[in-house]
């Protein structure tokens, strides 16, 4: 069974989704929770049997799909993808568990199960076409979730979401076909296997073009400034569960793909584009933070702050050293937990008041103390308070980039502090002061079902903030392999310098992480 | 005194005619049956046609076996040419016809199917297409083309609605113009080279090194225009949406596949040597027409309010996409053409069949046209299975993995990449993105809007019978599980295309 655990993880939810059509409407919620829990337990088991001392791929499976054209179903997991898979399973579980009263709940749960298949598939795929397959397929359930259960502008938002990503990914597909063609020219064999591509050293001019092609696909997904305009719409219109999954998992596909594809395939191009991308990332951090401050809608605040933090992830990724990349991967998890939780929290209040305008609230801390507490913890995590999960990721990302450029890191760091302002302002508007609105006086505090979703998230936020080692260890091992691959593959002198050789830095890195936490 | 010609039967190699003769004999058989006992039920003719096509398919498989053993077969004074292209395209022609013909067994009675002539004409048309693809001779191509087209005009007109007559007449006039262009173009080449055989023309032109380039240009322009009409390349496409709208949905789906593959094969035979002749302007003309066809058809499809018209424009766009294969002109691209078209047949026939089963006998008051977008609003609520299948076909047409057409698109774009047409590859990719919008539009209507009129869902399968559902089931399975067969299909097609020297 262990040989096929990844395939089981990928296809179990889909199979369960198909069978779900038979399940009665009244029992579908329990069915969904049960399936998602099994999936989560399987994912935890994967972590348990995962050997964290191995840097390469584990539990690899290979089935020939179109061998004449070099397309095979290859899946595998390493420290980089492991935790995102677990996160995906986790969020589907608590997402389904916390699902409020929804119309057509059966369709929703089946859709979520299919979405889970595509999410796990993206992070486990080791063949570019299989990756592309799940990547594209993930758009469909999300399109349906936003379009069918969303707000008044839901159709515009869902179509915009679909077309933006679809257009970007098609450019990426051309890039993938080129990559396979270069591999064919070099070896005489077609292959779309990522691990095969890793061995291919491309001239710098090719790298630049291919990097741009892949960048189009990934940057729209992340979404990076200036391609971010679809995201506020999608978040603004999506139902709570849609926003949670979108922010926690789907956006991570883009940042994950940067680490899986762009960096190891095109190390020279990554160095070449390091500063432009870092500048974009910093614009993203500052600009979206300012936009977030101007929002009246609390969900938009969370949405923009989520984009803002994605900028830090990009910055860490393009630090191109072990600290930065490890930090960015950790931050992906952290961002998933925290922004997912924030969207859930916004959903809680929306369920009660059917409005998301902050001016409608005020003094909620008196009425809903438990809600206010959890919101407060998540908010502190979001602004990156030490001893919360986000701090570890942000700190490492910035530390990584500090080695490349002091000034840009300083800018980014300041921006993150500024980010605290809008979050605190939003918190103040909503929770402090006196209760002004009559409707707010008798709001019910979070109920058991909501606590079931929120308490685990709170615990994770604090636990991994204090003791991030269980995650950092395996991530670090795999990232070291990626960075040393990049160092070996890079052609130009500048790239060799920018991407440090791991062997030399190893002692430096492992020690601080070991002691500090 | 003329001495009697002395020809041995062996040298005629009549086996090359067998696949065409089977539908012809079948058509005559149907007429004879009608002669003895008229007023038979349509199911008899449908099943007879299906059986005849089945026999034809087996005969083709035999021919394919001979081809893979001995290579290209010539026959009947070397007029017939059975090479890989001929065999592959005949497989598509006959296979798609077999999928089409059971669609006549609708729940509602449409009167064209009560005539045995419909089925006889249908089989004659297939024979015409088969002749068209299985020869190198411009005259026989012309004869095949006209046989098939004339039969097709009649089939459209038999739908017996005002719009059908309009469509048939429009198609007829446009077809006549195209035929004129074709014969004129052929004449120019005959005048230049003294031959109507494409390989002879190529050899002679090659030998004198394209000395009369001006005349070659004239000939090519006429031929291109004539294929433009047949393949509905922009700007010769204007008839397509109207004709599709006028004919029954099933026939429209059929027209988007079978006549086009026949025309593609002929275009491939003619333009193959011209592209490789190194005459730059030809490449430019083709490049431009490919890009314009893809892009403009997509843009027009965006603004349609009727699903059938949208699908008409979408099939124009797909034709432009596939035409790129002829421009690229490598073995991979030519294989990609057939590969794409096989997958396209499944998906497109499936989606037109979905329109066909929702066809009402009379137009309700609140509907502008037979298949307006509004009709499909909120379909997921009332007919979830049908809506899901329709969405599946739309996603496949949009090129979403892992559905059938994605593999075709991927292979086609890859052939552009390997053929050195980087910009074209990008244009093709971006066009797929544009196309995503209008396919998505139907999905949005079906899944995200509320039903406009309460109809209880029976509208969407008003016309459904077991045989229609079977065809849709086959198309859906072919669309979903294409990835299982992609490898074998690709190997098979590539071997055939490669062995015929394209």
Please name every model-derived segment.
Chain B
Residues 1-502:
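Alpha-helical transmembrane segments of multi-pass membrane proteins predominantly involved
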């Amino acid at each position: 069974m262990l040989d096929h655990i990844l395939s089981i993880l990928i296809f179990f939810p889909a199979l369960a989704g198909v069978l779900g059509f038979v399940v009665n409407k009244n029992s579908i919620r329990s069915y969904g929770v049960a399936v998602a829990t099994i999936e989560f337990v399987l994912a935890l088991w994967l972590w348990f049997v995962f050997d964290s001392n191995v840097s390469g791929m584990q539990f690899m499976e290979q089935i020939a799909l179109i061998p004449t054209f070099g397309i095979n179903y290859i899946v595998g997991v390493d420290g980089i993808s492991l935790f995102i898979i677990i996160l995906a399973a986790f969020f589907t579980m608590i997402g389904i568990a916390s699902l409020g009263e929804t119309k057509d709940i059966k369709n929703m749960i089946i859709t979520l199960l299919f979405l889970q298949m595509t999410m796990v598939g993206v992070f486990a795929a080791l063949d570019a076409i299989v990756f592309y397959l799940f990547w594209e397929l993930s758009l469909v359930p999300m399109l349906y979730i936003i379009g069918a259960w969303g707000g008044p502008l839901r159709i515009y938002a869902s179509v915009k979401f679909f077309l933006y990503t679809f257009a970007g990914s098609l450019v990426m597909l051309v890039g993938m076909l080129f990559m396979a063609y270069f591999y064919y020219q070099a070896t005489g064999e077609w292959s779309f296997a990522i691990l095969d591509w890793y061995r291919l050293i491309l001239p710098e001019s090719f790298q630049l073009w291919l990097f741009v092609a892949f960048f189009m696909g990934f940057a729209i997904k992340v979404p990076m400034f200036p391609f971010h305009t679809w995201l506020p719409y999608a978040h603004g219109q999506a139902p709570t569960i849609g926003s949670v999954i979108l922010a926690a998992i789907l956006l991570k596909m883009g940042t994950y793909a940067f680490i899986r594809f762009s960096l190891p395939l095109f190390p020279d191009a990554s160095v070449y584009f390091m500063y432009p991308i870092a500048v974009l990332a910093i614009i993203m951090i500052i600009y979206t933070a300012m936009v977030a401050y101007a929002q009246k809608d609390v969900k938009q605040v969370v949405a923009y702050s989520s984009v803002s933090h994605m900028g830090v992830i990009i910055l860490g990724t393009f630090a191109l050293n072990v600290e930065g990349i490890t930090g960015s991967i950790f931050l992906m998890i952290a961002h998933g937990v925290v922004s997912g939780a924030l969207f859930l929290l916004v959903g809680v209040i929306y369920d009660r008041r059917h409005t998301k305008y902050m001016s409608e609230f005020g003094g909620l801390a008196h009425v809903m103390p438990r809600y206010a507490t959890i919101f407060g913890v998540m908010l502190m995590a979001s602004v990156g308070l030490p001893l919360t999960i986000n701090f570890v990721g942000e700190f490492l990302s910035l530390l990584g980039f500090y080695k490349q450029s002091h000034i840009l890191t300083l800018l980014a760091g300041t921006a993150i502090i500024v980010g605290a302002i809008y979050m605190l302002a939003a918190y103040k508007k909503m929770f402090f002061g006196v209760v002004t609105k009559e409707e707010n006086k008798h709001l019910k505090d979070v109920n058991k079902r909501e606590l079931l979703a929120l308490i685990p998230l709170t615990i994770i936020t604090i636990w991994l903030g204090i003791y991030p080692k269980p995650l950092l260890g395996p991530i670090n091992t795999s990232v070291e392999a990626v960075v040393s691959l990049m160092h070996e593959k890079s052609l130009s002198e500048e790239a060799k310098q920018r991407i440090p050789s791991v062997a030399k830095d190893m002692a430096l890195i492992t020690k601080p992480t070991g002691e500090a936490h | 005194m003329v001495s009697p010609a002395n020809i041995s039967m062996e040298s005629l190699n009549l086996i090359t005619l067998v696949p065409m003769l089977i539908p012809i004999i079948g058509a005559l058989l149907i007429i004879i049956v009608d002669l003895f006992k008229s007023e038979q039920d349509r199911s008899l003719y449908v099943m007879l046609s299906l059986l005849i096509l089945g026999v034809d398919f087996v005969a083709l498989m035999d021919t394919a076996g001979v081809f893979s053993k001995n290579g290209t077969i010539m026959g009947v004074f070397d007029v017939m040419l059975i090479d890989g292209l001929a065999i592959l395209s005949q497989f598509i022609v006959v296979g798609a016809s077999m999928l089409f013909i059971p669609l006549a067994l609708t729940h509602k009675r449409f009167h064209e199917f009560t005539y045995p002539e419909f089925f006889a004409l249908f089989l004659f048309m297939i024979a015409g297409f088969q002749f068209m693809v299985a020869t190198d001779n411009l005259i026989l191509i012309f004869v095949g083309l006209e046989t098939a087209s004339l039969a097709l005009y009649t089939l459209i007109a038999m739908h017996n609605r005002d719009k059908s007559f309009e469509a048939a007449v429009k198609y007829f006039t446009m077809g006549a113009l195209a035929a004129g262009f074709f014969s004129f173009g052929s004449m120019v080449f005959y005048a230049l080279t003294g031959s109507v055989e494409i390989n002879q023309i190529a050899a002679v032109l090659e030998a004198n090194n394209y000395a009369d380039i001006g005349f070659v240009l004239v000939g090519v322009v006429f031929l291109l225009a004539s294929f433009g009409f047949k393949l509905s390349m922009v700007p010769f496409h204007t008839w397509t949406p109207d004709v599709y709208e006028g004919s029954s949905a099933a026939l429209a789906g059929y027209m988007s596949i079978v006549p086009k593959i026949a025309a593609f094969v002929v275009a491939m035979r003619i333009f193959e040597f011209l592209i490789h002749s190194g005459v730059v302007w030809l490449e430019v003309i083709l490049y431009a027409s490919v890009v314009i066809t893809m892009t403009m058809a997509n843009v027009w499809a965006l603004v349609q309010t009727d699903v059938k018209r949208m699908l008409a424009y979408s099939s124009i766009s797909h034709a432009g996409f596939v035409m790129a294969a002829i421009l690229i002109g490598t073995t991979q691209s030519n294989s990609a053409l057939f590969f794409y078209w096989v997958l396209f047949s499944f998906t497109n026939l499936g989606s037109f069949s979905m329109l066909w089963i929702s066809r009402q006998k009379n137009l309700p008051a609140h509907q502008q046209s037979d298949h307006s977008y509004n009709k499909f609003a909120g379909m997921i609520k009332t007919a979830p299975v049908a809506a899901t299948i329709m969405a599946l076909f739309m996603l496949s047409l949009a090129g979403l993995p892992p559905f059938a057409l994605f593999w075709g698109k991927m292979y086609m774009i890859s052939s552009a990449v390997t053929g050195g047409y980087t910009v074209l590859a990008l244009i093709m990719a971006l066009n797929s993105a544009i196309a995503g919008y209008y396919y998505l539009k139907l999905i949005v209507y079906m899944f995200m809007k509320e039903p406009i009129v309460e109809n209880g869902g029976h509208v969407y399968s008003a016309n459904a019978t077991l045989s229609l559902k079977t065809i849709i089931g086959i198309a859906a399975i072919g669309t979903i599980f294409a990835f299982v067969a992609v490898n074998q299909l690709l190997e098979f097609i590539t071997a055939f295309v490669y062995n015929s020297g394209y």
